[in-house]
Curated annotation (Swiss-Prot):
Primary gene name: leuA
Catalyzed reactions: 3-methyl-2-oxobutanoate + acetyl-CoA + H2O = (2S)-2-isopropylmalate + CoA + H(+)
Keywords: Amino-acid biosynthesis, Branched-chain amino acid biosynthesis, Cytoplasm, Leucine biosynthesis, Manganese, Metal-binding, Transferase
Enzyme class: transferase
Necessary cofactors: Mn(2+)
Functional note: Catalyzes the condensation of the acetyl group of acetyl-CoA with 3-methyl-2-oxobutanoate (2-ketoisovalerate) to form 3-carboxy-3-hydroxy-4-methylpentanoate (2-isopropylmalate).
Protein name: 2-isopropylmalate synthase
Chain sites annotated for binding Mn(2+): D14, H202, H204, N238
EC number(s) on file: 2.3.3.13
Region annotated Regulatory domain, chain positions: 392-523
């Protein structure tokens, strides 16, 4: 049996299900490219039949990704498989992933069928998917609670039908490692054609055991792990990709297993997913948390000074978190910024140097020294910018009355190239700024959540504001970044306004297409 574990990333499918606001196609493509750099073997990027937006994002990613296999999910229904195949047809290499529930509670309560009927549907779906590709994965949903005789029978028949990967999910995160390892071992002992497929596992974290269950599974013969960056996902989340990658790397001598993951891309990928998904990483999160390589105990610090491996089983550098002694100030030239971006893992194609350097100088003039996290934050915001923004914040001036708690904001907002100046009074500076921007733009946005975080340390740290806003029954996520919290808040609002403007344009375009179809049909 091979010692290579296939890493199947489902950040853009299962992970996205946890988000308050859906990612845009551009944001999904950014994450897909980061996953490709990270070295994932397979990336599951959506559920094409679920919506036109999901279909478009799967198709866009499938056209772009070259080094990872692109996968799409489908139920055990021909219409789902057709949509997946159509969206993936432009990919250099792709996989169709079809699934159906197999546990008694799901079969009887959700599907309201007999197990034999479900088995027939599964076999039919695998055979149908094989018409489009040899790479078909089949999942036994809620396998962790499926009677073992039924599970063995389902796996055997799915392999006979042509599935080349069989996924055993712990869908509700219910099993413990000894139990889950036993399920995998039983499949290898009792399914006669098990050697004709790769056994995969997909573990949820409801009891905090997703990583432990996944490691136990590969110790018992599974050779694919399904996971997400930062462990994001439905309910309590999924198995964490970075934890799996570093466990298999750090304990390679004991486990004898390896992956194709480029660990030096872990920190960068984790940060990107956290920012785009508006899901901060908890400080004590293994591998990528802010405290993962921080030592505060005097005894620990003393040991670290004597020998780093006294209290570190891996280094920050191993996940791409470099210790940098290079001071970047307003006197730093373009070559310094380019060199530092290269050391941080960014290629010239990942950012616009002219825009980034201009933003860097503005920030350096404000705070003096610019750090790595500042530079990465600026690169992130530059990557989010669009050339066709309908709204642009040109100026913001705020006056606050600390005795009454009121504030007045004056803004200049460019609306389709025309500058409009407005002022408003509000209950604090952020409220005043939002009211002024709304007046200037004529765009009313209902904000459902507001989150402020610091990007860096000290009083000059960049502030990042993430807002979720509801517009026409849809959630949109906006991000703003500035050393001034009120300015960051206004930028986040303008970001959302541009997203809603584009959504309206798309809706109008679809309406015109439908109208043209109706008119042509009536001729």
């Amino acid at each position: 049996m091979s010692n290579r574990v296939i890493i199947f990333d489902t950040t853009l499918r299962d992970g996205e299900q946890a988000l308050a606001a859906s990612l845009t196609v551009k944001e999904k493509l950014q994450i897909a490219l980061a996953l490709e750099r990270l070295g994932v073997d397979v990336m599951e990027v959506g559920f094409p039949v679920s919506s036109p937006g999901d279909f478009e994002s799967v198709q866009t990613i499938a056209k772009t990704i070259k080094n990872s296999r692109v996968c799409a999910l489908s139920r055990a229904l021909e219409k789902d498989i057709d949509a997946a195949a159509q969206a993936l047809s432009v990919a250099e290499q792709f996989r169709i992933h079809t699934f159906i529930s197999t546990s008694t509670i799901h079969v009887e309560s959700k599907l309201k069928r007999s197990f034999d009927q479900v088995l027939e549907m599964a076999v039919g779906a695998v055979k149908y998917a094989r018409r489009f590709t040899d790479d078909v994965e089949f999942s036994c949903e809620d396998a962790g609670r499926t009677p073992i005789d039924n599970l063995c029978r389902m796996v055997e028949e799915a392999i006979k039908a042509g599935a080349r990967t069989i996924n055993i999910p712990d869908t509700v995160g219910y099993t413990v490692p000894s139990e889950f390892g036993g399920i995998i071992q039983t499949l290898f002992n009792r399914v006669p054609n098990i050697d004709q497929a790769v056994i995969s596992v997909h573990c949820h974290d409801d009891l905090g055991l997703s990583v432990a269950n996944s490691i136990t599974a590969v110790q018992h013969g599974a050779r694919q792990i399904e996971c997400t960056v930062n462990g994001i996902g439905e309910r309590a989340g999924n198995c964490s990709l970075e934890e799996i990658a570093m466990i298999l790397s750090t304990r390679k001598g004991e486990l004898g297993l390896e992956t194709g993951i480029n660990a030096k891309e872990i920190h960068r990928t984790s940060s990107l997913v956290s920012q785009l998904c508006n899901m901060p990483v908890q400080a004590n999160k293994a591998i990528v948390g802010a405290n993962a390589f921080t030592h505060s105990s005097g005894i620990h610090q003393d040991g670290m000074l004597k020998a780093q491996n006294t209290y570190e089983i891996m280094t920050p550098e191993s996940i791409g978190l470099n210790r940098n002694n290079l001071n970047m100030t307003s006197r730093s030239g373009r070559h310094v910024i380019k060199h530092r971006m290269s050391e941080l893992g960014y290629g010239e194609q990942d950012y616009n140097m002219d825009v980034l350097y201009e933003e860097f100088l503005t920030l350096a003039d404000k705070k003096g020294q610019v750090f790595d996290y500042d530079l990465e934050a600026l690169a992130f915001m530059e990557a989010q910018a669009e050339t066709d923004d309908h709204y642009k914040l040109q100026q913001l001036v705020v006056h606050s009355d600390s005795t009454e708690g009121s504030a007045t904001a004056t803004v200049k907002v460019a609306v389709n190239g025309e500058t409009i100046t407005e002022a408003a009074t509000g209950n604090g500076p952020v409220d005043a700024a939002y009211k002024a921007v709304a007046r200037a733009s004529g765009c009313e946005i209902n904000i459902s959540s507001y989150q402020l975080s610091a990007k860096g340390e000290g009083q000059n740290a960049l502030g990042q504001v993430d807002i979720t806003a509801k517009y026409r029954e849809q959630n949109f996520h906006g991000v703003g970044l500035a050393t001034d919290v009120v300015e960051a808040s206004a930028k986040a609002l303008v970001h959302v306004m541009n997203l809603t403007w584009r959504a309206d344009k798309v809706a109008d375009c679809k309406q015109r297409i439908q109208q043209n179809k109706r008119e042509l049909g009536g001729v």
